[in-house]
């Protein structure tokens, strides 16, 4: 049976999104995270995707779980069948007390395989980078570059959250360079930030997904 090449993002400004997408969100407040991530995961769960939310301050795992439970009266049914995992960042990014980029990337890819083996349509994830120290920034930028290249080959949708209060102008450029597009608030509304090369990359990604769908 063929699988759809795209999925509803749950975020109005984004709309349907191809599998293989790796995009970022710049936020200022906890409410910014709630407004995007709760509908993002509800859409993924209802689209039969396996989901993983890696949390950090200001929105930790316990509160994230409570928010999904409040938004989705049937949330426990998804949780009971193991369709969603909600982790604190130190248990995922900093296992053994240090950041291991290749290990983290392989962990995402392994979960995508597990999702497909279990009959899910894909794997949806998010990670909040609030925990990231300045000393680890350059290593994390390299990790994001690896992720951006790798994820396009898998049925993965990934949203990375960056606090604008922790980013300088150079950081914002680093982040945008390693994501297919960015989501940010402008005058209260969420908007997409795309350059021409990124638009071309998305079009190429859609073509690749369409070709894969035809082959199945």
Model-derived features: where do they sit?
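Non-catalytic regulatory/interaction regions at protein termini and inter-domain linkers
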Residues: 1-203
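Amphipathic alpha-helical coiled-coil "transmission" helices that mediate dimerization
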Residues: 196-216
């Amino acid at each position: 049976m063929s699988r759809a090449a795209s999925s509803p993002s749950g975020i109005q400004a984004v709309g349907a999104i191809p599998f293989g997408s790796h995009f970022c969100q710049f936020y200022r407040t906890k409410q910014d995270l709630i407004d995007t991530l709760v509908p993002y995961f509800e859409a993924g769960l209802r689209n039969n995707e396996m989901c993983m939310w890696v949390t950090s301050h200001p929105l930790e795992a316990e509160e994230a779980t409570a928010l999904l439970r409040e938004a989705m009266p049937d949330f426990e049914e998804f949780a009971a069948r193991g369709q969603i995992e909600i982790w604190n960042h130190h248990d995922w990014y900093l296992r053994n007390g240090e950041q291991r980029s290749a290990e983290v990337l392989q962990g995402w890819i392994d979960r995508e395989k597990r999702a497909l083996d279990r009959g899910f349509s894909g794997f949806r994830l998010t990670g909040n980078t609030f925990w990231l120290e300045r000393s680890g920034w350059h290593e994390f930028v390299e990790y994001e570059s690896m992720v951006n290249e790798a994820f396009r080959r898998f049925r993965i949708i990934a949203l990375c959250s960056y606090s604008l209060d922790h980013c300088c102008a150079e950081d914002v450029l680093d982040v945008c360079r390693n994501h297919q597009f960015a989501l940010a608030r402008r005058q209260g509304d969420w908007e997409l930030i795309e350059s021409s090369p990124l638009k071309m990359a998305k079009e190429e990604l859609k073509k690749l997904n369409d070709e894969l769908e035809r082959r199945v």
